[in-house]
Regions:
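Conserved lysine of the Walker
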Residues: 17
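Hydrophobic positions on the alpha1 helix immediately C-terminal to the Walker A/P-loop
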Residues: 20, 24
Length: 234
């Protein structure tokens, strides 16, 4: 799997982009690379890169998350440290972008530096089983909205089609025609297929390269909460 210096993951809510971003960061770290990941999603508080802080730290991955992430503050703000991802070219940088056009606005401030370096991959995380992107045509509309909001074009697609814990190899294989059509409509290559290890080992060779996933804990799944945190229903 070829790596760019900067990789950005974006997609509609529920596409699994945060889990993809975290696992990609861990994969790069396993290759011995210096990795920094930033959570630029300041819209959706329920799926956050910061929830994987412990596993990222253990792997040696630097995490930059919105100020007040994992607290009871409703409107987190991007820290100044996030500029490191576009200025420090000695690290492999990963950006977890907001889940729709509103969330993608935060990326706009970094676009001039990204284009100047021109060593990036912006990946659309596709899941054909999610509402609002059940057809390739709907997914292309979401892609266009995100591109218009942030000022950067997608370069690749990753197939993250899944049904959560009910996902099997057949679930992924059934998404093949959808992903092929999406690739044609968007005129973009498929960067990779992602799947949990138990599913990935059952997929035929044509689905390579495969990003093998470990499920990221979500804020409301964590066994313990820091003082000041609130549950999902709070």
């Amino acid at each position: 799997m070829e790596h760019k210096r900067l990789t950005l993951f974006a997609g509609h809510y529920g596409s699994g982009k945060t889990n993809i971003a975290v696992n990609y960061a861990l994969a790069l770290a396993r290759e011995g690379k210096a990795v920094c990941i930033a959570d630029l999603d300041i819209v959706n508080p329920y799926f956050r890169t910061a929830d994987s802080a412990a596993v990222l730290e253990k792997a040696g991955v630097e995490l930059i998350s919105p100020q007040f992430a994992n607290t009871n503050v409703d409107l987190p703000a991007l820290p100044a440290e996030a500029y490191k991802l576009v200025t420090d070219r000695s690290t492999y940088a990963i950006m977890d972008i907001g889940g729709d056009d509103r969330g993608a606005y935060a990326l706009g401030r970094y676009v001039p530096a990204i284009l100047e370096e021109n060593n990036y991959r912006m990946v659309f995380v596709a899941n054909c089983y999610r509402p609002l992107t059940r057809t390739p045509e709907e997914a292309v509309e979401v892609m266009a909205e995100i591109e218009a909001a942030c000022g950067l074009k997608f370069t690749d697609i990753i197939n993250n089609s899944n049904l959560g814990s009910e996902t099997t190899a057949k679930t992924v294989e059934a998404s093949a025609s959808y992903i092929e059509k999406l690739s044609q409509l968007a005129d973009l290559p498929v960067f990779a297929t992602s799947a949990m290890e138990s599913v990935a080992e059952q997929l035929p060779p044509e689905y390579s390269p495969i990003l093998v996933l470990q499920l990221q804990e979500k804020y409301f799944d964590l066994p313990t909460q820091k003082p000041g945190n609130r549950p999902l229903w709070g």
